[in-house]
């Protein structure tokens, strides 16, 4: 049986924390930032955790 392949799009978008949770980045902070307020850009910088219901699916895709 061949090796399992990691889903590269998922592994690029999510980072695994030491406790096993997944961090994600918020969309909307790549371009057109001049229209956004400082507060909005600051809030987009925060990296929330992925919801519990989807963590298992993403971990399987990352082969963790």
UniProtKB/Swiss-Prot annotation:
GO molecular function, one term: structural constituent of ribosome
Identification of the protein by name: Large ribosomal subunit protein bL35
Keyword Ribosomal protein attached: yes
Family membership noted in the UniProt record: Belongs to the bacterial ribosomal protein bL35 family.
InterPro entries: Ribosomal_bL35, Ribosomal_bL35-like, Ribosomal_bL35_CS, Ribosomal_bL35_sf
Keyword Ribonucleoprotein annotated: yes
Pfam families in UniProt: Ribosomal_L35p (PF01632)
HAMAP family named in the record: Ribosomal_bL35 (MF_00514)
Biased composition (Basic residues): 23-35
Organism of origin: Chlamydia pneumoniae (Chlamydophila pneumoniae)
Region (Disordered): 1-55
PANTHER family named among the record's database cross-references: 54S RIBOSOMAL PROTEIN BL35M, LARGE RIBOSOMAL SUBUNIT PROTEIN BL35M
Record GO biological process: translation
Superkingdom field: Bacteria
GO cellular component: cytosolic large ribosomal subunit
Record keywords: Ribonucleoprotein, Ribosomal protein
């Amino acid at each position: 049986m061949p090796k399992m392949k990691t889903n590269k799009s998922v592994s690029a978008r999510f980072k695994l924390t030491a406790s096993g949770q997944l961090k994600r980045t918020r969309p909307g902070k790549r371009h057109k930032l001049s229209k956004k307020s400082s507060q909005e850009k600051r809030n987009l910088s925060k990296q929330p955790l992925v919801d519990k219901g989807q963590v298992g699916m993403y971990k399987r895709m990352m082969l963790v």
